Amino acid sequence: EGPGHEFLKSVMPHMLDDEAGRADLDSAARIIEERTMKTRQFFNEIADDWDEMNREILGEFSLPEVILKAVPEDCRVAADLGCGTGEVLEHLRGACRELIGVDGSPRMLELARRRFDEHMDGISLRIGELDHLPLRDGEADFICINLVLHHLSRPSAALGEIARVLNPGGRVLITDFDQHLQENMRTSYGDRWLGFSLDDMRSAMERAGLS
């Protein structure tokens, strides 16, 4: 992420040719995997309280209603990445023919299935990480990712995957926190990033091909 992005791209081939460089890359990969596992464990543990935690953060603001207004009229397939317990998917029913919810937490997806009970027609819940999405290229006409990027070790990887699975001409809606200094969010809510500036987000989206 950030200014070092292009530098890393330029030195990566040389690191792969060097034994010490390969060891550094392997170490970095292990760190990312450990962080992914910790994030998954965190969300499994707080899944039953997640909806209430969201209400604590957002208050009376209805994020699902805002997302619903952004769905294109001709939407066939909508995907909610980091869908949690399925609250946004519930609001999107009727707006698209098919809904896809992706989450890395098995417990979150279990609660999402309970939300819809036996009424799963047109809804596909998929386990997966956002840097390796379980969607085909160009599968979704509309993608939303809500208050999720700040939990990820590599937000840029998720943006690249969004670009891959978004249908050409499709629409993506990203909601997240502005940059802030509330360090307690790391321990209370598992945040890895303290929000993002609008300029940084725009630059990251452009690099991912989402401009």
Give residue spans per PLM region:
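N-terminal auxiliary segments of SAM/dcSAM-dependent transferases
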Residues: 1-41
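Class I SAM-dependent methyltransferase Rossmann-like catalytic core
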Residues: 47-56
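Conserved alpha-helix/loop element of class I SAM-dependent methyltransferases that forms part
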Residues: 57-77
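Class I SAM-dependent methyltransferase SAM/SAH-binding core
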Residues: 79, 85-132
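A short acidic, Gly/Pro-enriched loop at the edge of an enzyme's catalytic core
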Residues: 131-143
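A short SAM/SAH-binding and catalytic strip from SAM-dependent methyltransferases
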Residues: 141-154
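A short glycine-rich, Lys/Arg-flanked "PGG" loop and its adjoining helix->strand segment in the class I
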Residues: 156-171
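C-terminal alpha-helical "lid/dimerization" subdomain adjacent to the S-adenosyl-L-methionine
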Residues: 171-211
